[in-house]
């Protein structure tokens, strides 16, 4: 068994440590309507196509009940579309500030390429959003071989179509010769649905939801507890492996290749 390609997520995995770019915007568009949502609630659907993310938030029982209390009805599709349009407008303005590669990512990518491994990517951002992020990330030294957005396929995560399109464009098959790595539950489901080795990265992830400064300053026992919660969440949602930092990825690959593991 030889791994021939790795498909990376973007925000929270390779760029934007902690996946903070969309978080504040999701909270803001609800707050403007008098409906407060928590950071934990805002993060829960992370990884989905962003309009699906807005829709998922409106379907959470607490948020739906609060909306109904204020407006006398549940959120409509018109409400969802209006909030999404506001989300896009605000996000486009701030995205360039959230495209810096996470520490260690560029070095890992360089090492993978030295081994002849192809680098693909999927995202919950639209093509228009990714035009901004990918351009800025490239200026800072990170550019995968291929990028697929939900706009390029019939549906985004948790459907496997973005991974399949990467496989076709990169010329790699079968799917168990590829790894999908990401930082959200929807990433884990996407990878498993595509029949790929699926890896969850914890530090810098949306699921952990901490900035680099918070990680550095947190009590080690408290941080360890939070890391293990995220690790378990990834495993419960299909991860074959979890890693704390991207630097551990190659050791996972070696385990797969040397032990001739089989996807279950």
Curated annotation (Swiss-Prot):
Keywords: Hydrolase, Magnesium, Metal-binding, Schiff base. SUPFAM superfamilies: HAD-like. Its EC number is 3.11.1.1. Pfam families: Hydrolase (PF00702). Gene3D superfamilies: HAD superfamily/HAD-like (3.40.50.1000), Putative phosphatase, domain 2 (1.10.150.240). It catalyses: phosphonoacetaldehyde + H2O = acetaldehyde + phosphate + H(+). GO terms for molecular function: magnesium ion binding; phosphoglycolate phosphatase activity; phosphonoacetaldehyde hydrolase activity. GO terms for cellular component: cytosol. Coiled coil: none annotated. The active site is at residues 9, 50. It is an enzyme of class 3 (hydrolase). Its cofactor is Mg(2+). PANTHER family: PHOSPHOGLYCOLATE PHOSPHATASE (PTHR43434), PHOSPHONOACETALDEHYDE HYDROLASE (PTHR43434:SF19). Belongs to the HAD-like hydrolase superfamily. PhnX family. Homodimer. This is Phosphonoacetaldehyde hydrolase. It comes from Bacillus cereus (strain AH820).
């Amino acid at each position: 068994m030889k791994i021939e390609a790795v498909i990376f997520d973007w925000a929270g995995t390779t760029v934007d440590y902690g996946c903070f770019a969309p978080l504040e915007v999701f909270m803001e568009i609800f707050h403007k309507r008098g409906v407060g949502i928590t950071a934990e609630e805002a993060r829960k659907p992370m990884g989905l196509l962003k309009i699906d993310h807005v829709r998922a938030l409106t379907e959470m029982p607490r948020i739906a009940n609060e909306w109904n209390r204020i407006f006398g009805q549940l959120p409509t599709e018109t409400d969802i579309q209006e909030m999404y349009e506001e989300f896009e407008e605000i996000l486009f303005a701030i995205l360039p500030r959230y495209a810096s590669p996470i520490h260690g990512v560029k070095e890992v990518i360089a090492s993978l390429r030295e081994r002849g491994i192809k680098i693909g990517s999927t995202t919950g951002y639209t093509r228009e959003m990714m035009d901004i992020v990918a351009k800025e990330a490239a200026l800072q030294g990170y550019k995968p071989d291929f990028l697929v957005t939900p706009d390029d396929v019939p549906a985004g995560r948790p459907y496997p179509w973005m991974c399949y399109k990467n496989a076709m464009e990169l010329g790699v098959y079968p799917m168990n010769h590829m790894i999908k790595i990401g930082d959200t539950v929807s990433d884990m489901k996407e990878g498993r649905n595509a029949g790929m080795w699926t890896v969850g990265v914890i530090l810098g992830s949306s699921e952990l939801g901490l900035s680099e400064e918070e990680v550095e300053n947190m009590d080690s026992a408290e941080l360890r507890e939070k890391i293990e919660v995220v690790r378990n969440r990834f495993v419960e949602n299909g991860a074959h492996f979890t890693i704390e930092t991207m630097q551990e990825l190659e050791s996972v690959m070696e385990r797969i290749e040397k032990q001739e593991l089989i996807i279950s």
